[in-house]
């Protein structure tokens, strides 16, 4: 049998074990970046704020927070089989996501510590937090007789390269959206304790503050590196080998000019906001809908709240944000969810691969069209939008 990323400690206790979730476009990703560019960053523009955030990290407010108590004893056995499967799937995805953050931050802290010690220390503290989160989630999985094989994940996961600019945008949004997701669940369960299916959720209030501090760090880092956020590398990498040439420098300067146009940063802001929002919405209203129902949450209302709040938060650092209040915004996201349901039905139906591909094509085209229309929606200028959220 092929090696699994999930190890069963006692498979008979969980209906002969859980098959690891199949990797899809909606699955958590593992990232790498240009470490040389990161270590050469000049932080002087906003070094004072970064030092203040690093001091917050040093205090490690949640050092003693992630300690399990007696509430965990027997909690797994109280869940019915359907809820158990939904919750284990949530644990697996969340643990993988946290572990992905740990690997990126840890590698950054090691690679840049000589030339950029302040930045390296910040990443080391965030790696500490992400490792703590992943370990706590993995411990909860052990209550169900399972554990993620994190070593296997490290060695066998495909790593996606993102330049520093993209890492800043994507990770900032990931941390901030994580804050709003956790605090929304915590507040809902605080008001509806009967829907709290597992004691893990008692930890979400303090947990989300780690996510918030991480997001604040990337906010400060982007303010310290406005050029790096908008520029591109002078090096070209082909087949693992790096090449430089004087012509690359001229080409780089032209691309640098384009990337420093005000319009460019606005386009990137819209791209990453839409990518994060659409991915979350499609996942939560598609494959995760029943999980939120088990918590007494309506997935659509929950996601719209989280998206609206994250969009407001992003206005503090991005030049523009999405117009989530446009009547068509959520309607088009709902259409993508509908298309994905049809695509899933086709994939699980009888028929050969060729016929299935032709049946899927209209829905793929429709999804592309919906995303394009969403991207082309007139954005909200952050300088006009910000006062309403402060």
From Swiss-Prot:
Q: Which UniProt keywords apply?
A: Chlorophyll biosynthesis, Iron, Metal-binding, NADP, Oxidoreductase, Photosynthesis
This protein's pathway reads: Porphyrin-containing compound metabolism; chlorophyll biosynthesis (light-independent)
Positions of disulphide bridges? none
Single GO molecular function: magnesium-protoporphyrin IX monomethyl ester (oxidative) cyclase activity
- In short, the EC number is 1.14.13.81
A Pfam family of this chain: Rubrerythrin
| NCBIfam families for this protein | AcsF, PRK13654.1
This chain belongs to which protein, by name? Answer: Magnesium-protoporphyrin IX monomethyl ester [oxidative] cyclase
Q: Which gene encodes it?
A: acsF
């Amino acid at each position: 049998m092929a090696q699994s990323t999930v190890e069963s400690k006692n498979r008979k206790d969980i209906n002969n074990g859980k098959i690891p979730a199949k990797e899809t476009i909606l699955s958590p990703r593992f990232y790498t970046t240009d470490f040389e560019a990161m270590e050469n960053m000049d932080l002087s523009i906003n070094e004072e704020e970064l030092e203040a955030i690093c001091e917050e990290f040093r205090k490690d407010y949640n050092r003693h927070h992630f300690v399990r108590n007696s509430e965990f004893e027997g909690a797994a056995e109280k869940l019915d089989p359907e809820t158990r499967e939904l919750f284990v799937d949530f644990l697996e995805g969340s643990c993988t996501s946290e572990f992905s953050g740990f690997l990126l931050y840890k590698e950054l802290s090691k690679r840049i510590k000589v030339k950029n010690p302040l930045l390296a220390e910040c990443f080391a503290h965030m790696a500490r937090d992400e490792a703590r989160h992943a370990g706590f989630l993995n411990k909860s999985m052990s209550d169900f007789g399972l554990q993620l094989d994190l070593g296997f994940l490290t060695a066998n996961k495909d790593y996606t390269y993102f330049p520093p600019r993209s890492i800043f945008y994507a990770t900032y949004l990931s941390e901030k959206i994580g804050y709003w997701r956790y605090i929304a669940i915590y507040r809902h369960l605080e008001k509806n304790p009967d829907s709290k299916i597992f004691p893990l959720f008692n930890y979400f209030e303090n947990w989300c503050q780690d996510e918030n501090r991480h997001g604040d760090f990337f906010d400060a880092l982007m303010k310290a590196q406005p050029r790096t956020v908008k520029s591109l590398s002078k090096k070209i990498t082909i087949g693992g080998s790096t090449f430089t040439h004087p012509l690359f420098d001229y080409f780089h300067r032209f691309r640098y000019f384009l990337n420093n146009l005000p319009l460019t940063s606005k386009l990137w802001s819209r791209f990453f906001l839409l990518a994060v929002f659409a991915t979350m919405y499609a996942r939560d209203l598609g494959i995760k809908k029943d999980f939120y129902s088990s918590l007494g949450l309506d997935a659509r209302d929950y996601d719209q709240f989280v998206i609206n709040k994250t969009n407001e938060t992003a206005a503090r650092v991005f030049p523009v944000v999405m117009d989530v209040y446009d009547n068509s915004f959520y309607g088009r996201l709902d259409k993508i969810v509908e298309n994905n349901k049809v695509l899933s039905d086709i994939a699980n139906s009888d028929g050969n691969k060729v016929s299935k591909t032709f049946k899927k094509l209209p829905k793929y085209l429709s999804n592309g069209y919906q995303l394009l229309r969403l991207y082309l929606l007139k954005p909200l200028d952050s300088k006009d939008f910000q006062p309403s959220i402060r």
